């Protein structure tokens, strides 16, 4: 996979800046976000508009363990198992973080939250299903903008771990 040259007007986000600084190869994908697709969610919209399998496109969710907030990255086709996420980070339990907290700590809006370039660094757990792909897509830091990269590169950049945290 080769690094895509940014086209005029594509801009950058903290997510792409972090990838560039880490020297990681990635691609950028843009699509026109529409509120008409919100019954399915932002991630499903991205998968459909970009022509990718829903198991290959991942969403970023933030949870609170009581002592810290952690980030889970799971396929848009499923849900995050909060018990499995808590176990992966050595906590007893986890609950979804308030969206306002997630936006404040990540620096992104809901529907555009990326695990990359977050304002506050969090432990990150990637669902193990990502490892079957050479490239996964996730939010590039704004609605209608995704980045594609190798899941092992994502783990390296974020110092993340994998665990079976996705459910279908």
PLM ranges: what are they?
Residues 1-168:
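Extended, low-hydrophobicity, polar/charged segments
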């Amino acid at each position: 996979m080769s690094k895509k040259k940014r086209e005029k007007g594509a801009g950058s986000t903290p997510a792409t800046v972090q990838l560039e600084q880490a020297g990681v190869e990635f691609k950028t994908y843009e699509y026109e976000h529409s509120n008409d697709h919100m019954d399915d969610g932002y991630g499903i919209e991205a998968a459909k508009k970009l022509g990718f399998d829903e198991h290959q496109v991942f969403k970023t969710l933030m949870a609170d363990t009581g002592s810290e907030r952690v980030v889970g990255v799971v396929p848009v086709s499923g849900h995050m198992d909060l018990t499995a996420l808590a176990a992966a980070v050595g906590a007893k339990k986890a609950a979804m973080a308030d969206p306002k907290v997630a936006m404040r700590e990540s620096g992104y809006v809901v529907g555009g939250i990326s695990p990359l370039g977050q304002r506050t660094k969090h432990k990150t757990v990637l669902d193990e299903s990502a490892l079957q792909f050479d490239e996964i897509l996730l939010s590039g830091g704004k609605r209608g903008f995704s980045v594609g990269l190798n899941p092992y590169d994502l783990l390296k950049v974020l110092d993340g771990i994998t665990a079976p945290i996705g459910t279908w």
